[in-house]
């Protein structure tokens, strides 16, 4: 199973992790980093582990998400049985229609 982060997902993850550390401290940073790592392991173990992403239901392909915590979710697309693309680490307070920018 190959899991690939898009450039946008890498950028968003970096911003979120950097902000977690600078605003809330090392413990918050570690907690978020561990949540991302665990989500990747779960997706690798079972690609359909995440729920279907309702904001992308009209898009072609199978888009899913895994909650990282109360505020963030990891949005991904199952490309085929051996490839998954991580599209975004999404702040759930954002307008879900903007998620289409990452597909």
Predicted region positions:
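Arg/Lys-rich, positively charged N-terminal/basic patches that mediate binding to nucleic acids
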Residues: 1-37
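Charged, solvent-exposed alpha-helical segments that act as regulatory interaction surfaces
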Residues: 22, 26, 45, 49-52, ...
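A short, surface-exposed loop/turn module that caps and links secondary-structure elements
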Residues: 41-67
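Enriched for short, Lys/Arg-rich terminal
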Residues: 68-103
């Amino acid at each position: 199973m190959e899991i690939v982060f898009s450039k946008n997902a890498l950028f968003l993850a970096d911003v979120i992790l950097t902000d977690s550390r600078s605003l809330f401290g090392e413990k918050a940073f570690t907690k978020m980093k561990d949540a991302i790592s665990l989500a990747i392991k779960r997706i690798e173990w079972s690609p359909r582990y995440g729920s279907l992403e309702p904001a992308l239901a009209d898009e072609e392909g199978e888009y899913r998400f895994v909650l990282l915590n109360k505020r963030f979710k990891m949005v991904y697309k199952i490309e085929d049985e051996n490839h998954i693309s991580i599209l975004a680490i999404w702040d759930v307070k954002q307008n879900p229609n903007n998620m289409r920018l990452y597909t």
